[in-house]
From Swiss-Prot:
The keyword Membrane applies. The lineage of its organism: Bacteria, Pseudomonadati, Pseudomonadota, Betaproteobacteria, Neisseriales. This is Opacity protein opA60. It comes from Neisseria gonorrhoeae. It is found in: Cell outer membrane. It holds the Pfam family Opacity. GO terms for molecular function: porin activity. The gene is opaH.
Length: 238
């Protein structure tokens, strides 16, 4: 330990591995609310993804307690899903005409935690001159953008058999119906989280830090966003 008891301002740089859980509360297709998307599949309602991102912090060490402000940007998640379902409506036995309903769904979604600006209060446990486990609490102002584009196309396919020997069948696409839904939001909210980890003093001023943090970004309109992060970084005290 240094002569000043470890007190002073510091900067820290981390590389974090984040598990991101995004839950969208879209209404069911039969819901009466027509102002929100109702055709998206469960694939876009409940998203789990992982990313790696940098994080920087500045803080002050009071010799036991620390306060720190941090900033991070996350990777943009985007994906698409296409599905098709063919359902037989009826077959006319008297003439062999078959009618099927073909439903195509095309969904495109994006989610981006644009930024997180946090303030943490952290307590270091003095185990020995080198190791310092710590716990803390964090409040953060987060900015999130997300969008979904859902297209549902339904057509009836009529198949007419040929009366001629070895003749080809004839198909007709009738009664096409298309439903397009789009939603885009840019939201800013204050969320809460917890921090834990351990610091190892390489020198009196340089510390290797391994940490974990959980953060609930708050209620983002129809979206809930939570992150679990494991990080490794270095902290330099002036």
């Amino acid at each position: 330990a240094s002569e000043d008891g470890g007190r002073g301002p510091y900067v820290q740089a981390d590389l974090a591995y984040a598990y991101e859980h995004i839950t969208h509360d879209y209404p069911e297709p039969t819901a009466p609310n027509k102002n929100k998307i109702s055709t998206v599949s469960d694939y876009f309602r409940n998203i789990r993804t992982r990313s790696v991102h940098p994080r920087v912090s500045v803080g002050y060490d009071f010799g036991g307690w620390r306060i720190a402000a941090d900033y991070a940007r996350y990777r943009k998640w985007n994906n698409n899903k296409y599905s098709v379902n063919i359902e037989n409506v009826r077959i006319r036995k008297e003439n062999g005409i078959r009618i099927d309903r073909k439903t195509e769904n095309q969904e495109n979604g994006t989610f981006h935690a644009v930024s997180s600006l946090g303030l943490s209060a952290i307590y270091d446990f003095q185990i020995n001159d080198k190791f310092k486990p710590y716990i803390g609490a964090r409040v953060a102002y987060g900015h999130v953008r997300h969008s979904i584009d859902s297209t549902k196309k339904t057509i009836e396919v009529t198949t007419v058999p040929s009366n001629a020997p070895n003749g080809a069948v004839t198909t007709y696409n009738t009664d096409p119906k298309t439903q397009n839904d789009y939603q885009s939001n840019s939201i800013r909210r204050v969320g809460l989280g917890v921090i834990a980890g351990v610091g190892f003093d390489i020198t009196p001023k340089l510390t290797l830090d391994a940490g974990y943090r959980y953060h609930n970004w708050g209620r983002l309109e129809n979206t809930r966003f939570k992150t679990h992060e494991a990080s490794l970084g270095v902290r330099y005290r002036f």
